[in-house]
Amino acid sequence: MSGHSKWATTKHKKAVIDARRGKMFARLIKNIEVAARVGGGDPVGNPTLYDAIQKAKKSSVPNGNIERARKRGAGEEVGGADWQVITYEGYAPNGVAVLIECLTDNRNRAAGEVRVAMTRNGGAMADPGSVAYLFSRKGVVTLEKNGLTEDDVLAAVLDAGAEEVNDLGDSFEVIAEPGDLVAVRTALQDAGIDYESAEASFQPSVSMPVDLDGARKVFKLVDALEDSDDVHNVWTNADVSDEVLAALDGE
């Protein structure tokens, strides 16, 4: 590979990374603004806002951006958008269920972008309720291992309402009912255990195993959906084995 083409490739990769980082920052800022609007601008009395701010800080969002978003949401500063949360349902290739959560100030634009991403990548939209029943809303706390064992984490969160602790390789995932999320996060803090994020999420109650080709198609569809600024979260019930993930990483 020549020096020029190598530089062009590196430059392209950096542009992709920067674009994704910009989208991630925008989503984190939206989270803060919406949380402040719904529950008030004081993070001490608004756990959802507290968690949104913590997640933004851990993702290196500048403090000034965080504070301006909080103020816009709380009505202390003009300029906040009228964000709406809209959930769409559909299917990826191989019958994999997909839940798409949009946070948008333009419902028609969001619907159009979701539909285009789905149809161009082998997916199909589904009627409301036809996919959602395959998922349960849960509180999810993720934390780096940092020398901790699964038993260490379980001992800290069991009495706070945690349902299970999952080993994700480099990190742990604590699952609880959404109403117990603050208690679980607080229990970790009281035990001196730092966490990466604490938020409500959808966990599949029924999983759909996919092979390497199926996983490629599902991830391609998810990437296309997440390219939309209006798409906030995408959940699927695809069950991707460690072997398939390793094969994808090697491509």
UniProtKB/Swiss-Prot annotation:
<dbReference type="InterPro" id="IPR029072">
    <property type="entry name" value="YebC-like"/>
</dbReference>
<dbReference type="InterPro" id="IPR049083">
    <property type="entry name" value="TACO1_YebC_N"/>
</dbReference>
<dbReference type="GO" id="GO:0005829">
    <property type="term" value="C:cytosol"/>
</dbReference>
<comment type="similarity">
    <text>Belongs to the TACO1 family.</text>
</comment>
<keyword id="KW-0804">Transcription</keyword>
<dbReference type="InterPro" id="IPR048300">
    <property type="entry name" value="TACO1_YebC-like_2nd/3rd_dom"/>
</dbReference>
<keyword id="KW-0238">DNA-binding</keyword>
<dbReference type="GO" id="GO:0003677">
    <property type="term" value="F:DNA binding"/>
</dbReference>
<dbReference type="Pfam" id="PF01709">
    <property type="entry name" value="Transcrip_reg"/>
</dbReference>
<protein>
    <recommendedName>
        <fullName>Probable transcriptional regulatory protein ML0475</fullName>
    </recommendedName>
</protein>
<dbReference type="InterPro" id="IPR002876">
    <property type="entry name" value="Transcrip_reg_TACO1-like"/>
</dbReference>
<dbReference type="InterPro" id="IPR026564">
    <property type="entry name" value="Transcrip_reg_TACO1-like_dom3"/>
</dbReference>
<keyword id="KW-0963">Cytoplasm</keyword>
<dbReference type="Pfam" id="PF20772">
    <property type="entry name" value="TACO1_YebC_N"/>
</dbReference>
<keyword id="KW-0805">Transcription regulation</keyword>
<dbReference type="GO" id="GO:0006355">
    <property type="term" value="P:regulation of DNA-templated transcription"/>
</dbReference>
<dbReference type="InterPro" id="IPR017856">
    <property type="entry name" value="Integrase-like_N"/>
</dbReference>
